[in-house]
UniProtKB/Swiss-Prot annotation:
The lineage of its organism: Bacteria, Pseudomonadati, Pseudomonadota, Alphaproteobacteria, Hyphomicrobiales. It is an enzyme of class 7 (translocase). The gene is lolD. Disulfide bonds: none annotated. Pfam families: ABC_tran. InterPro entries: AAA+_ATPase, ABC_transporter-like_ATP-bd, ABC_transporter-like_CS, ABC_transpr_LolD-like, MacB-like_ATP-bd, P-loop_NTPase. Its EC number is 7.6.2.-. GO terms for cellular component: plasma membrane. This is Lipoprotein-releasing system ATP-binding protein LolD. It comes from Nitrobacter hamburgensis (strain DSM 10229 / NCIMB 13809 / X14). GO terms for biological process: lipoprotein localization to outer membrane; protein localization to outer membrane. GO terms for molecular function: ATP binding; ATP hydrolysis activity; transmembrane transporter activity.
Amino acid sequence: MEQGAKEIPVVYLHDIRRQYTQGETKLTILDGTKLALWAGQSVALVAPSGSGKSTLLHIAGLLESPDAGEVYIGGTATSGLSDVERTRIRRTDIGFVYQSHRLLPEFTALENVMLPQMIRGLRRSETVKRAREILSYLGLEDRVTHRPAELSGGEQQRVAIARAVANAPRVLLADEPTGNLDPNTADHVFNALMQLVKATRVAMLIATHNMELADRMDRRVSLENGHVVELD
């Protein structure tokens, strides 16, 4: 697991195993997978399509349960938790960013970022203040009243990032967050993610095919035969 001897990883996947059934065939996607994510560290997950990147992200984010193994969030084992408790952890400790922004089209940028906080039951005045601060930090202070259709692709994805960190999560999981963007816009979105890692010390795991961006992160790992492999 490494890092500091007394430091607890934000997320630790221990001996994760995941199989899927396809007809009469069982496909092993993850096979004894281990991965530790540390506070303030950015990790690139680079592997071919179909290797299990999305499955690993879903398990790390408690969206999917492994067939065997344990997911620790802040040192707490999650396998024995109720669905209610797992949902609470997802809402408070984990942020998600996808290739498609998944913003609610009828809501403004501000309202989209307020939503995760309102679901937690925070006061409206608090959610407005927090949402404005994050959008301003990401250079979107002039776009808060715009709906997704009125924003560029890069702006939409930055709003999605703002929404993902609205509840100050411990870990940010991103699945090809720049995959639909041109190189220049992708660079701006990636820089926004890296700024947030430094400013908030959130742990970040990004699944990406973009090796240029991956090389700018603290660690690079791949998936080979269901195992996480550290890359030089």
